[in-house]
């Protein structure tokens, strides 16, 4: 419907707050508490690419994917979030900002290893960028 709201979706490819279960965005092959042998698309299905999916809908004014793995990308993320709130304030429609992030604890990695996983695994699967910006119809 083009509601004037902004969603900030933190995508760390896991349900970390509940013990590390598979999420809709868990990558193929990624091990979780509920996929101990890795996510198998033949069994659990493929991950959902949220921005790509929502950008096809009428009523969505902004769909953008960013990351927070280094200072440059943190600044890009801040601008994207601000843009989402501006769209909301100006009644331009629904905005979603997807933020690729880490979960070192439930990924079983050090923070440095987790940042590298975002670079080498998540960004290739979930490319950064603006998927839709502007008219909501």
Predicted regions and their residues:
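"Short basic amphipathic alpha-helical interaction patches in structured regions
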Residues: 1, 11, 21-22, 106
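Thiamine diphosphate
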Residues: 1-16, 79-83
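Short coil/turn connectors at secondary-structure junctions
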Residues: 1-5, 10, 58-60, 91-94
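Short, structured patches in soluble enzyme cores that scaffold and shape functional sites
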Residues: 9, 65-67, 98-101
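Short, well-ordered, mixed-charge alpha-helical segments that flank or form enzyme active sites
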Residues: 14-19, 71-75, 103-107
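Short, hinge-like loop/turn segments at secondary-structure boundaries
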Residues: 23-27, 113-116
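Conserved thiamine diphosphate
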Residues: 24-90
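Flexible, low-complexity linker and terminal segments
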Residues: 89-137
């Amino acid at each position: 419907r083009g509601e004037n709201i902004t969603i900030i979706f933190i995508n760390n490819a896991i349900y970390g707050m509940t013990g590390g279960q598979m999420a809709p965005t868990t990558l193929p092959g990624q091990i979780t508490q509920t996929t101990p042998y890795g996510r198998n698309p033949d069994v659990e299905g493929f991950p959902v690419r949220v921005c790509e999916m929502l950008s096809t809908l009428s009523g969505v004014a902004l769909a953008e994917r960013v990351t927070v793995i280094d200072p440059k990308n943190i600044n890009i993320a801040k601008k994207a979030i601000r843009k989402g709130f501006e769209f909301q304030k100006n009644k331009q429609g629904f905005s979603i900002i997807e933020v690729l992030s880490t979960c070192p604890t439930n990924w079983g990695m050090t923070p440095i290893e987790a940042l590298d996983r975002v670079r080498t695994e998540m960004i290739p699967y979930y490319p950064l960028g603006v998927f839709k910006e502007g008219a909501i119809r």
